[in-house]
UniProtKB/Swiss-Prot annotation:
This is Iron-sulfur cluster assembly protein CyaY. GO terms for cellular component: cytosol. It comes from Buchnera aphidicola subsp. Acyrthosiphon pisum (strain APS). Signal peptide: none annotated. Involved in iron-sulfur (Fe-S) cluster assembly. May act as a regulator of Fe-S biogenesis. The gene is cyaY. The keyword Metal-binding applies. It comes from the Bacteria.
Length: 116
């Protein structure tokens, strides 16, 4: 007999992980609010970050795939949650490394984010 997966529980855990990530992103962006012009908004689990040069970074959840997607000027990235971190499924880099680099490039400032 096949064991049914509890997708409701898995989805609840996914939402917790996504909420946690979005809160950490907000906290980190707010650290720089007096230093650089960054605006962001969140609507339906889509975060749009706008820099003073009008470039965008967009982060959203892909619930059916249980992934986070990140779109930057440089590329698009898909992240799976592995070993307590979001890992890019192509480069095996963690989310924060790619996100921090993209924000630094798009803001023309060296940004360092606290990941905890």
């Amino acid at each position: 007999m096949k064991k049914k997966l509890n997708t409701k529980k898995e989805n609840n855990n996914f939402y917790i992980l996504v909420n946690d990530l979005f809160l950490k992103i907000e906290d980190n962006l707010n650290l720089y609010e007096n230093e650089i012009d960054i605006d962001y908004e969140i609507q339906d689990y889509v975060m749009t970050i706008t820099f003073s040069n009008k470039t965008l970074i967009i982060i959203n959840k892909q619930e059916p795939l249980q992934q986070i997607w990140l779109a930057t000027m440089q590329n698009g990235y898909h992240f799976d949650y592995k070993n307590n971190q979001w890992i890019c499924n192509r480069s095996n880099k963690n989310f924060w490394e790619i996100f921090e680099n993209a924000c630094s490039i798009q803001s023309n400032k060296d940004l360092i984010f606290c990941k905890k």
